[in-house]
Amino acid sequence: MRTTIARRIAACVVVVAAACVAAAATTAAAGVPPGADASIPSGAGYIWDSVAIGGGGFVTAIVPSRSEPGIAYARTDVGGAYRWSAKEGRWTPLLDWVGEDQTGLLGIDGLAIDPDNAAHVWLLAGIAYLNDGRSAILRSTDYGKTFEVIDVTAQFKTHGNGFGRQGGERLAVDPGAGKRLYLGSRRDGLFESGDGGKTWQRNTALPVTATPNDVGLSIVLPDPASVKGGRAQRLFVGVSRYGSVGPNLYRSDDAGATFAPVAGAPAGLMPQRAAFDGAGKLYITYANGAGPHPDKAGLEPVDRGQVWQYDIAGDSWRNVTPVGWTRPFAGVSVDPRNPRRLVVSTINTFIAQGDARGDRIFVSHDAGANWVDVIARGFKRDAAGVPWLEGHAIHWAGSVEFDPLDPRAAWVTSGNGVFRTADIDATPATWTFTVKGLEETVPLGLVSMPGAPLVSAIGDYDGFVHDDPARPGRIHRPEIGTTTGLDAAARRPGSMVRVGDAMLVTRDGGLTWTRTAALQGKRGQVAMASDGATLVHSPQGASVLYRSTDEGASWTRVAGLEGSRLRAVADPVNPKVFYAYDDKALMASLDGGASFQARASLPPGGSRLIRAYPGREGDLWVALRDGGLVRSRDGGASFAPVAGVRYCGAVGFGKAAPGKREPTVYIWGSVGGVRGVYRSLDTGRSWQRINDDAHQYGGPGDGHFIVGDMNRFGVVYMSTAGRGIVYGRPATP
């Protein structure tokens, strides 16, 4: 198991209310110990942690402390924020306290730390498509152990999973005053705070509020060399638009009272990130698009870029792009001990990098006159015990940073995690996959069968066979990328099916997988009959389902079941029986999935992931969200509510308790008005909450699952919106 921090952080129930001076931004303290270490005993006697995969998602930026050695913060697009401790050699997740009504706060669009105090950290949080776009400033004075939540939705919204999310930083602390902050919004212009982020006021001097790509003001950079009277007098603001559309760099020399466009910037490019050298120069990376990848309309291809040096006093520009390179550039950092030593990274560039293809990193020792391609010079990757990294590169390298207090070392972010080198000037430089404690995958499926290891399906990186949840598992091979559907045959051990852009079947528990010869549509969901002989596939975006009885060699259309996002679920006993929930009724098939008929009416809005009681035919449980939890004992002909469950987002089963015959039931739901993870040892007659407010993870996310371990009593797994697969186990076995 991962090292458990022998420290129980007392619950902190603090409610703070404050009215904003400029607008109705509401403030409330997170009523738990947010940022507490992931694997600590919860109030219910459970230890919660992440199933170890190792990274797996886009880390959009890293911000090392300039005042305290060994401390850095990282932000991600859907998995929250993390704090690195060199002393502990791991990352600590900071936002596991986020509830289901705050899931969007796991998308971090900006991060700032006080340059003089690493304990003071601010996050700009929100995702446009979650929680009605709720956006907030999260403010901490204790390294992210607790946060104050300042709701800013009424003033501006952000999108931590939007285009340009690796740019920035759009949130900055004034180097002359730790309580003054600046924020470049995506649609509503420039904002300032004079009270540490509690209240925000719009700065109307900047004439830009929004951009055509909805990225807006992507860089806000107060100049430390300009501090006078307790605040920076000079500010630079980068705008995410082509210079041909309008100025994309503005400058203020009077603490933001007035702004003027900076002439001479590249016309056909957009600024990505920027860094001062402390000697009068500003370095900016550019690309033809906000990134990290092209837009669908083709207006921002992200296939070209440059690096420029701006002389602040002389108001002049110099192109310092590595000679011969036209690729898009993103990350940039300057050695704080040597203003002539720079590092930059490309983005959306896929060139040979060891056994894979990815971005390039360049170092200059003469202010950009000459560059060394540190990847081409000699590249060594250390997977640090994460076996699936084989064949995967550093890519989407949106942020690269020298360690300010040990500038031989450098960090670079990637679409699959974070890498660090202890000596970027070494030949070869060894880049270590530094992701212990940082789990940022989107789980989409999970199977636990008696006598077999846990098996997962995730976005981007297929999924894994997990022999031990504390150690990274074996990635499914052949790899197909995002795997949206996974199922197992209840009565044929070792038989499973998974689907993404291809469909594969295994008969040996995932040691080997064989592609089906045919497929009607891609991705979506798939069900496998209890004997493993029949497959029912609901392709993504399709309004019909398909059935195969020859391991995918041929497919026929399923009758009686039409509608998008439907999914079939196999009965665990009878191989001829399948079920589906179509948002108004329970549908059943008695002919091996060839046709479905309506059995019973059900309220709309429930989870399409029906759960069948293990080892019993026709015993169905349906999570109806606000409709609670219902159960059928007659194959879906009738349903009865499970008493006491007012809300249920997911239901699953696990191994029975010692001395019990009935499987343990687990739910993500509300009992007694409190939402959380619950278990029942008596098939739903009584419930015990087994998580606490510090371990909510934003709820079950896109995977919509909660799965009990069929081999270990009391162990339960849950999907998240971007924090990987989390699991709880009794603190006392």
Where is each model-derived feature located?
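Bacterial N-terminal signal peptides that target proteins for export
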Residues: R2-V13
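Bacterial N-terminal signal peptides
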Residues: C12-A23
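Extracellular glycan-interacting surfaces
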Residues: V16, A28-P733
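Low-complexity intrinsically disordered segments
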Residues: M1-R2, A23-A24
